[in-house]
């Protein structure tokens, strides 16, 4: 109990004072300076425990605790910065919708599939289904949330189609298996809970899944399918 209280007192000290000298100075009274006539000597006496009415804390312990506190602060800051949408103020509904889903897709609680139909840099109409969680892990989304770059489907995504060249591809991802050419059209099987995600707009998206059509000014069409992942027991 005493050890815990001492630790709490030390933590309070390193929070309150920026340097060890500041802490020592706080323990020195005007009377000490009057009799000793030497600030450095007064500091040494406080450090040795001969002066001061508060907690005696050695320099190395103060500096070690200070370093640990700074490391903890930087770690928390880094964790906060892992969200690519952090600090961004997207104006378009599509980017706002992605920002709302980013954290859940990063921590595995949700695996969203994004459908995009738009024109590429060559003016060709393309469409495709993107595993949002996978793309978040494999590229920097800050350029999308800041508006510097436009998110578009690629031939390496879950599904891709170029309406002009008629190039069509489909690929599994770490989260989904592609089940193509069924009577129900294109289906995706979640690899974690093995639930089927149906992207047919006329059908139900499936268990633990929702379909959200986004009103957007930057794409011809955008739809987000959210699947709440539940590991199969």
UniProtKB/Swiss-Prot annotation:
<comment type="function">
    <text>May be involved in spermatogenesis.</text>
</comment>
<dbReference type="GO" id="GO:0005737">
    <property type="term" value="C:cytoplasm"/>
</dbReference>
<dbReference type="GO" id="GO:0005634">
    <property type="term" value="C:nucleus"/>
</dbReference>
<protein>
    <recommendedName>
        <fullName>Cilia- and flagella-associated protein 299</fullName>
    </recommendedName>
</protein>
<dbReference type="Pfam" id="PF14713">
    <property type="entry name" value="DUF4464"/>
</dbReference>
<keyword id="KW-0539">Nucleus</keyword>
<keyword id="KW-0963">Cytoplasm</keyword>
<dbReference type="InterPro" id="IPR027887">
    <property type="entry name" value="DUF4464"/>
</dbReference>
């Amino acid at each position: 109990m005493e050890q815990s209280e001492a630790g709490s007192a030390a933590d309070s000290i390193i929070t309150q004072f920026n340097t060890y000298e500041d802490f020592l100075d706080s323990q020195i009274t005007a009377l000490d300076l009057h009799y000793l006539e030497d600030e450095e000597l007064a500091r040494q006496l406080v450090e040795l425990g001969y002066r001061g009415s508060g907690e005696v804390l050695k320099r190395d312990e103060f500096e070690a605790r200070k370093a640990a506190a700074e490391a903890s602060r930087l770690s928390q800051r880094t964790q906060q910065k892992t969200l690519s949408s952090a600090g961004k103020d997207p104006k378009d509904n599509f980017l706002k919708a992605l920002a709302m889903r980013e954290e859940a897709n990063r921590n595995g609680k949700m695996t969203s599939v994004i459908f995009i139909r738009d024109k590429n840099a060559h003016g060709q109409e393309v469409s495709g289904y993107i595993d949002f969680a996978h793309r978040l892990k494999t590229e920097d989304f800050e350029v999308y949330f800041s508006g510097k770059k436009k998110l578009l489907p690629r031939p390496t995504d879950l599904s891709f189609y170029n309406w002009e060249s008629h190039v069509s591809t489909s690929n599994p991802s770490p989260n989904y298996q592609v089940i193509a050419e069924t009577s129900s059209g294109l289906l995706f099987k979640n690899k974690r809970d093995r639930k089927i995600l149906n992207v047919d707009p006329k059908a139900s998206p499936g268990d633990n899944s929702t379909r959200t059509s986004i009103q957007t000014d930057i794409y011809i069409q955008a739809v987000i399918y959210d699947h709440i992942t539940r590991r199969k027991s």
